[in-house]
Amino acid sequence: MMKTSINILNAIDDNKKISITLTSCPHYLITGGTGSGKTTFSLYLIAKLCLSYKEATVYILDFKGDENFQRFNNYENYFSYTDCMIGLKEIYEIFNNRLINTEDFSPLIIFIDELASMISYFSGSNSEKNKIQKIIAEILMMGRSKKVHIITSTQRPDSSLFANGARDNYTFKLGLGNLSSEGKKMIFPSSDMLFKKCNLGYGYVSLHSNEPIFVGVPAFSNYKKIYSVIKLHLGGDKNKN
C-alpha cells in the first residue's frame, strides 16, 4: 500500500507541489470546458493513483465513448454509453458488500466521465436517474472508510446532478480553463477571489473547501505508460479470457 503523498499539481504562485493521498482526498471533482485539459488530467490522476496504490481496482464509466478511453474497451471494468448503468450496479454491489464487512479492503477507484451527459440521458426514466444519483451520493458520503473513491469529470457540475447535497463531499475540486462566474460558484461557492486567465492545463483547485489555489497540470508526454499502468488495474483483458 501507498505510504507517501502523491505530487499531482503545481501551485504556480508558491512554486510548490500539491500533494494528495486517498485518505486525505478520497473523492475528486474535475470540471472545465471543452479543450481545458480535463481528460488529460483525469488520465494522469488515475495513473498516478495506480502507481501508488498497487492493489487498487479501477472502474471507468465513459458514457460518451471518448476516444481517449477507447483503448480500454476490451477491459472488464470499462463501460461506455448505456452499459455505464451495468458498471454502476456492479460497483454498488461491491460497495454494499464492503459496508457489511470489516476486512481491510484495497482501494476501489471509480472514474465517471461526463456525468452530466449520463444523467441527462437517463432522465427519461426517473427511476434510473434517481438510482444513479443515489449510488453516487452514498459512495461520496460513506465510501472513504471502505476505500471506495470517485473521480468525476464533467463540464458543468450543477448541484442538480447530485442528490442530498452530495457534491459537497468532494474533497478535491479542480476547475480547469476559464470558468464562467456560474461555474466558479458551483465548485468554489465560498470564494470571492479574482481568478487569473487560464490557458490549457491551468486552473484552480480547492482542497477540503479551502480557498482556491492557482495551479498547473505537470507536463508529461508518455501517454503509452499512462495507458499501460491503468490497464493493469481494469480487471483484465476480455480478449484473453
Regions found by a protein language model. Give the residues of each.
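Conserved C-terminal "switch" segment of AAA+ ATPases
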Residues: 192-208
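Glycine-centered helix-coil hinge/cap
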Residues: 142, 188-191
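Structured C-terminal subdomain patch of bacterial secreted/periplasmic proteins
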Residues: 203-230
